[in-house]
């Protein structure tokens, strides 16, 4: 973090990165040069409004990371310079002049803090127009006339940044005008939505400059993506300065500039000035609509043959950059709601846009056709409601998960006294949820529905199970067992809490507690039994033999099984020959043909059960065996997908989007990290976090004995590396650490890789415990605590490490000035410095300290917008109280002070 004036950039770079400032009630703001603009190019912050095409040169491939770092550096350079001005103001002896200058600086600072990137809603669309031409072109007079209605003859060499409201097709836009002081550069080309080329009709050089600027712009960006307007100014034409560029030459140039529109203007009395900017705004809006129509069908319907054209009035003009700036664009929502139809009229398209917010609705069903992604059931005897559901299965909007399987199933009621079978509209989604509604209408209206999280469930078919194991064979070891399903079942059972399970695997409806093979299977405290794993293979189900009813152990969970007593027997399914009066199952001694009878009866219904680890059961029944098979397989696939998603969740959060190997390699490549910090053994793979250094495995064992207050040891390959720890390791390294801890060797020799452990331990303890070789502090009359504050402000990492190594707990917790209360941790949090914040906490700075206004370091981190610093502080117990308190600025201006700006101010301790 650089607090040098200008953020280490040239004035031209600062100008090109600056955006329009905010603050002030004027309809437009004139901020020449843009030195106090908001962070990021433009109000939306964020690069080109259209994707660059046509194979741009290599220099255009500027990474987002580099651009972001440059913008942060520019942004953070403003406040230190402003506060340096405040310090200089204090030296002015004339108090009246001092107060006047201070008020002006405060106004500038407030305009910077309240720029549109911090205040303007992302829903406000923007148009970014660049004005280019040489100093004699008259472009500054053109812009000034448009903004103020007056004529100013002077040309602005540095250009300017301006804002004005403009209305296009009945919609208001924030027009950002960038008067470029020189030729178009890469950043300018990436920023603009449109370009106005300006030349003077009485100046040949300005005329020739236009085409040179055009060629330069084309080297950075495809000219077909940028609307252009050519303007010839008449302001300087007089008897002494006659017209040099005739109309034919000007129109020939407009043809060379991709046939752009040509205007002649006069800023003296306003000829065509308003028309130029209105026309360029119209061109930008029209281009965006054209791109929306081109992108929309491809985005939602990659295989659609054709779409009818949509009039411009039917689609609201929306800034295409909103997708980048605000997270989503209105158009992306619009395009995702276009249905999968070969041809769509304008009227239907408007209906779809209106109905997209409530998914699905009866309006959406009017223009639907039968979906071809679900299999037809022409051979099945389905009732009318089921056929209607099948015809309208694609009536699913973008607001809900798309089902991978859906249809009408019978579900048994969970009420103990009246367990009836009722029709339900059941959907299985790819997010691991099984939902059911009383009807298709309720599903489409998203009401009266219930859902089952399949993560901790299994699916079973009553009367069918895995082949029974013999007493000498462990359950589940049959060669025909499905290993994948067994593994899933074990994972589910292992993840349960509060419910004991046995090691053996049996069927939920056929427990055998008296058998030696199932001796471990008995009801738990909540009536739970160990369940067998689900196997979707039909031959495994068919091989299972039903047990006699006298040997069946009834389930005692919340929902009774089908083998329970006669008085609790639920009524048979309506699908079973549609007989509502089927007789009760016999619970007496079975006949010799009992098993076959049970199998025949099981074939009459096509039921399957979803069972959770908590003992809940949901009974469903399909119309055919094939349909049940498909449902069971689909549910099992989603159970497996849910489990796999849980297993990979940790991997996704370890390094965010970074690859572990790349992150570790980045730590290894830091200067000095190729050798152990203590014995110089090659390729160290252990780390000390607070030292920011790598070491060999033998030295790491010695460091562990030092204690975590001296060295926090972690494996480079075996442990997790969150971003904040990686930031510390990559910022420091062995070379920096040894420049501090071995800064005063005075002839001592380090032990080598072949030295014995005792010798290495003596060296390490002398180095870190006794601090015998610690580099001396620089000679200064400033106390150590104040030097620490200075090191944080100046972003001096080596000095910070040295001061922390020398300092006591009282010294590192010293505050800045009397009555201020800010510690070094407050300052590092306000500066969003993750490395300094983490090191200060490790070396004993109090995370609970508060400044004079009652603010904790967490409040400073949140005001600075640093989620990384906030996470570190919360992890170490920093309280969040006080983050909403308004700080009291140190300076005491009369009016207009912005409290939030004070948190960005680094203390003036130099």
UniProtKB/Swiss-Prot annotation:
GO biological process, alphabetically ordered: cellular response to reactive oxygen species; proteasome-mediated ubiquitin-dependent protein catabolic process; protein import into nucleus
Region (Small GTPase-like): 119-410
Keywords: ANK repeat, Cytoplasm, GTP-binding, GTPase activation, Metal-binding, Nucleotide-binding, Phosphoprotein, Repeat, Zinc, Zinc-finger
Region (Disordered): 1-26, 462-603, 888-910
Tissue distribution of the protein: Widely expressed, with highest levels in brain.
Domain PH: 402-640
Pfam families: Ank_2, ArfGap, Ras
ANK repeats: 783-812, 820-849, 853-882
Phosphoserine modification, residue list: 478, 573
Low complexity composition bias: residue spans: 10-19, 558-567
Chain sites annotated for binding GTP: 133-140, 177-181, 233-236
Taxonomy, superkingdom: Eukaryota
Residues in GLD domain copies: 122-296
A GO CC annotation given for this chain: cytoplasm
Residue span, Arf-GAP domain: 661-781
Modified residues (Phosphothreonine): 359, 361
Entries under Gene3D superfamilies matching the protein: Ankyrin repeat-containing domain, Arf GTPase activating protein, P-loop containing nucleotide triphosphate hydrolases, Pleckstrin-homology domain (PH domain)/Phosphotyrosine-binding domain (PTB)
SMART domains on file: ArfGap (SM00105), PH (SM00233), RAB (SM00175), RAS (SM00173)
Localization: Cytoplasm
Function: GTPase-activating protein for the ADP ribosylation factor family (Potential). GTPase which may be involved in the degradation of expanded polyglutamine proteins through the ubiquitin-proteasome pathway.
Assembly with partners or alone: Interacts with PML. Interacts with expanded polyglutamine proteins.
Family: Belongs to the centaurin gamma-like family.
Protein's UniProt name: Arf-GAP with GTPase, ANK repeat and PH domain-containing protein 3
